Amino acid sequence: MTKNIFLAVAAVAALASCKKDPTLDERLAGTWNLSDLSLSGTVTTPIGALPITITDSLIRANNTLDLAINEDETQTVVWNMDVRALITAPGLGSFGTDIQDTINGTWYAVDGGGVTPDSLYITADGEKTGYEILSFFETSLRLRSVETIVDPDLGSQTFTQEVTFIK
């Protein structure tokens, strides 16, 4: 009898310890606070290509990326951005501007399995943007995206954006 009780307790303990590892989506879910923002690219002008950089000079309160996994298993995102940025271009100098935006949409992550980088995809207003996960720890997340903007007057502009979040 004691042997059967011991085996039952051991079986329950073994089953309890067999908890599956959280998925990349589950590990990313939560509220992240923006701590760093930078963009770089080249703008085509009538006098030629002009390299520019944009860096944050002031990150205001409530700059959050909220990645939620809802009870119905949908995954929603709300990204609030309110940053004072410094734009720098050779020959033009530097000037400040405000970057304010709220993105509402859906998201999913792709685990690269150690072969390719992990990725985060956000879809908002019918457009999907992919972010390479450069680094991801329990309390920090660094993302990079490369986006091409097509302007009817200036043509195609490509920008690289890197953002860092902390919990």
Regions found by a protein language model. Name each.
Residues M1-N4, K19:
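Positively charged n-region of N-terminal signal peptides that target proteins for export
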Residues I5-A10:
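Sec-dependent signal peptide hydrophobic core
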Residues A14-S17:
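C-terminal motif of bacterial Sec signal peptides marking the signal peptidase cleavage site
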Residues K19-K167:
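Lipid interaction determinants
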